[in-house]
Swiss-Prot record:
SUPFAM superfamilies: GroEL apical domain-like, GroEL equatorial domain-like, GroEL-intermediate domain like. GO terms for cellular component: cytoplasm. Its EC number is 5.6.1.7. It comes from Leifsonia xyli subsp. xyli (strain CTCB07). This is Chaperonin GroEL. Keywords: ATP-binding, Chaperone, Cytoplasm, Isomerase, Nucleotide-binding. Pfam families: Cpn60_TCP1 (PF00118). It is an enzyme of class 5 (isomerase). NCBIfam families: GroEL, PRK00013.1, PRK12849.1, PRK12850.1, PRK12851.1. Belongs to the chaperonin (HSP60) family. Forms a cylinder of 14 subunits composed of two heptameric rings stacked back-to-back. Interacts with the co-chaperonin GroES. It is found in: Cytoplasm.
Length: 539
């Protein structure tokens, strides 16, 4: 395909136009006075959202240079969303301000490389102050405040705080669509996986259609079990111990399954068989998780263990197991806490080293099942459009709240950036174009607060000047127009979100400023539409 090339100022200005179109669309959503953006979909109902990354993803521009500029800023929003779960609009506004100031200085003759170095040093200094000013999240109320700001709804904030309080910071909080109105919270006790009993005959509670065993043994086998001959030795030992048995295996069928069912119906021996969760290597890993949680061993010929040689000490144990037709829950496994902690640390290391979003999500689920728990927030609404928007808002707020628990919180509303900047620039000593680069950051970090003020119908310059003189942590509550202690008023942001937004915006701004040429695909001319046969003829 033929290419078109732009150089110097033309190249940079083309990219900036694309950035501005995208940023101007996204920034109307910032702050309590921000509005929504409607996104048309080719199929189904349109989406209404105030989430920066969702809006950015939908924007496609015709001009090839503008398109590249917009794509670069999409990357800022996406990276911030991936790392922190929120702050996408703030990151976009910061990127726009940094690029605007930076290009003005490049056009005036400043050295782009020195500007980039100055920007990087200033961002590092501001980030250090932000992290230093962060306060640990100590109460459920603080989590609720953070989530409420992200979701724009105190009820959602309270539910998320309740969920995180119950499952802990390693736990998983998922959001599902509900058929009812309102928002509900469902908590899972213990480890749960999505495989149920292999036969209805295993049910012990007919009313609830569940198999419930107290103080049960658990056989964990990474193989298919078809012959009862393999199972009999361990079944006899469990019967002698007067216990019940949960069998988790690749599959249980044929003679083995039939014999277990007959013994259950006759009241000789209570057991239940379920398929192992997952596939391939993930199944092996999950079986090992279950073994460590329950203090058992995975029975597999790979490690030299045969079913007929299994003894009771190789079985896992749990205070309670509950099995339905769709899922299995293991409550209070008898595993060694040190081994569980070691497994948790191993999975956490795998999460840090994984490049795949899907793998990270699955590892996070495994981690939660071992270390915390699982909470499901069920979101309902009157229409499909409202339901999608509400679900998305809750998902963002959950990630925001988890980021707050992870690294702490700072004053919200753009206040933390301005006040961290004030402290950082007093200590920073740079010269020449590096000092100019630092000054670009000094100007740009005011942009989020200015935009919040504009969206709330206030004068941005006056607001920023006033906040700069206030004590640390005090700023504008844009919802009421009052100047307050932001943390006491419950207006806070996770420091991870604010830090990531600034760092990612600065990274893209540096690329913009040091660009000397842009190579883009030449737009193809649309093919002429063929006339319909017989058009314009009388018959």
């Amino acid at each position: 395909m033929a290419k078109i090339i732009a150089f110097d100022e033309d190249a940079r200005r083309g990219l900036e136009r694309g950035l501005n179109i995208l940023a101007d669309t996204v920034k109307v959503t910032l702050g309590p006075g921000g509005c929504n953006v409607v996104l048309e979909k080719k199929w189904g109902a349109p989406t209404i959202t105030n989430d920066g990354v969702s809006i950015a993803k939908e924007i496609e521009l015709d001009d090839p240079y503008e398109k590249i500029g917009a794509e670069l800023v999409k990357e800022v929003a996406k990276k911030t969303d991936d790392v922190a779960g929120d702050g996408t609009t703030t990151a976009t506004v910061l990127a726009q301000a940094l690029v605007k100031e930076g290009l003005r200085n490049v056009a005036a003759g400043a050295d782009p490389i020195s500007l980039k170095r100055g920007i990087e040093k200033a961002v590092e200094a501001v980030t250090a102050e932000l992290v230093g000013n962060a306060k640990e999240v100590e109460s459920k109320a603080q989590i609720a405040a953070t989530a409420s700001i992200s979701a724009g709804d105190t009820t959602i904030g309270d539910i998320i705080a309740e969920a995180i309080d119950k499952v802990g910071k390693e736990g998983v909080v998922t959001v599902e669509e509900s058929n009812t109105f309102g928002t509900e919270l469902e908590l899972t006790e213990g480890m749960r996986f999505d495989k149920g009993f292999l036969s209805q005959y295993f049910v012990t509670d007919q009313d609830r259609q569940e198999a419930v065993f107290e103080d049960a043994y658990i056989l964990i086998a990474n193989q298919k079990i078809s012959s009862i001959k393999d199972l009999l030795p361990i079944v006899d030992k469990v019967i002698q111990a007067n216990k019940q048995l949960l069998i988790i295996a690749e599959d249980v069928d044929g003679e083995a399954l039939a014999t277990l069912i007959v013994n259950k119906i006759r009241g000789i021996f209570k057991s239940v068989a379920v398929k192992a969760p997952g596939f391939g290597d993930r199944r092996k890993a999950m079986l090992q998780d279950i073994a460590i949680l329950t203090g058992g061993q995975v029975i597999s010929e790979e490690v030299g263990l045969k079913l007929e040689n299994v003894t009771l000490d190789l079985l896992g144990k749990a205070r309670k197991v509950v099995i339905t037709k769709d899922e299995t829950t293991i409550v209070e496994g008898a595993g060694d806490p040190d081994q569980i902690a070691g497994r948790v640390a191993q999975i956490r290391g795998e999460i840090d080293n994984s490049d795949s979003d899907y793998d990270r999500e699955k590892l996070q689920e495994r981690l939660a099942k071992l270390a915390g728990g699982v909470a499901v927030i069920k979101a309902g609404a009157a229409t499909e459009v409202e339901l999608k928007e509400r679900k998305h808002r809750i998902e963002d707020a959950v990630r925001n709240a988890k980021a707050a628990v992870e690294e702490g919180i700072v004053a919200g509303g753009g206040v933390a950036l301005i006040q961290a900047g004030k402290l950082a620039f007093e200590k920073l000593s740079l010269e020449g174009d590096e000092a100019t680069g630092a000054n670009i950051v000094k100007v740009a970090i005011e942009a989020p607060m200015k935009q919040i003020a504009i969206n709330a119908g206030m004068e941005p310059g006056v607001v920023v000047a006033r906040v700069r003189e206030l004590p640390l942590g005090h700023g504008l509550n844009a919802a009421t127009g009052e100047y307050v202690d932001m943390l006491i008023a419950g207006i806070n942001d996770p420091v991870k979100v604010t830090r990531s937004a600034l760092q990612n915006a600065a990274s893209i701004a540096g690329l913009f400023l040091t660009t000397e040429a842009v190579v883009a695909d030449k737009p193809e001319k649309a093919a002429p539409v063929a006339a319909e046969p017989g058009a314009g003829m009388d018959f």
